[in-house]
Amino acid sequence: MCLMLLLLLNLEATVKAAVLIPQSSVCPNAEANNFLQNVKVNLKVINSLSSKASSRRPSDYLNRSTSPWTLSRNEDPDRYPSVIWEAQCRHQRCVNAEGKLDHHMNSVLIQQEILVLKREPEKCPFTFRVEKMLVGVGCTCVSSIVRHAS
């Protein structure tokens, strides 16, 4: 009896949700064969870093580096994660021990390719696709390339 009541409540909640959320004609058809009615995705990220490594403050590196960078907020409500912090090098050149720019060294962005979930199409509220995204994660110093005219 209890199981039957739970099933009826679940069905009622599903019907109400379908009524509240307008669907576009390009959204997947719920009546189509093999259409999944409910998909649960656990987006919880398990932090596998040791407590010693995770206790370091990343902001220390962006300021103490010989190739310092700033972090900018990249926000997209149609993406998961919706907020991604991206690094941008502060200078084209590197900073020496005295805090002056070293014209023999270049500051370059370190990039990492990540996977994000992107809502598609925007009129289908629960349809996502996996997308690759190139994100700046920090900056480093490299030797300048010197080309001699011949």
From Swiss-Prot:
Alphabetical list of SUPFAM superfamilies matching this protein: Cystine-knot cytokines (SSF57501)
Biological function: Effector cytokine of innate and adaptive immune system involved in antimicrobial host defense and maintenance of tissue integrity. Signals via IL17RA-IL17RC heterodimeric receptor complex, triggering homotypic interaction of IL17RA and IL17RC chains with TRAF3IP2 adapter. This leads to downstream TRAF6-mediated activation of NF-kappa-B and MAPkinase pathways ultimately resulting in transcriptional activation of cytokines, chemokines, antimicrobial peptides and matrix metalloproteinases, with potential strong immune inflammation.
Gene responsible for this protein: Il17a
Glycosylation sites: N63
Membrane-spanning ranges: none
Disulfide-bonded cysteines: C89-C139, C94-C141
Source species of the chain: Rattus norvegicus (Rat)
InterPro entries: Cystine-knot_cytokine, IL-17_chr, IL-17_fam
Quaternary context: Homodimer. Forms complexes with IL17RA and IL17RC receptors with 2:1 binding stoichiometry: two receptor chains for one interleukin molecule. IL17A homodimer preferentially drives the formation of IL17RA-IL17RC heterodimeric receptor complex. IL17A homodimer adopts an asymmetrical ternary structure with one IL17RA molecule, allowing for high affinity interactions of one IL17A monomer with one IL17RA molecule (via D1 and D2 domains), while disfavoring binding of a second IL17RA molecule on the other IL17A monomer. Heterodimer with IL17F.
Lineage: Eukaryota, Metazoa, Chordata, Craniata, Vertebrata
Gene Ontology CC annotations of this record: external side of plasma membrane; extracellular space
Principal subcellular localization: secreted
Family to which this protein belongs: Belongs to the IL-17 family.
Signal peptide: 1-17
Compartments where found: Secreted
Polar residues composition-biased segments: 62-72
GO biological process: adaptive immune response; cellular response to glucocorticoid stimulus; cellular response to interleukin-1; defense response to fungus; defense response to Gram-negative bacterium; defense response to Gram-positive bacterium; fibroblast activation; gene expression
Record protein name field: Interleukin-17A
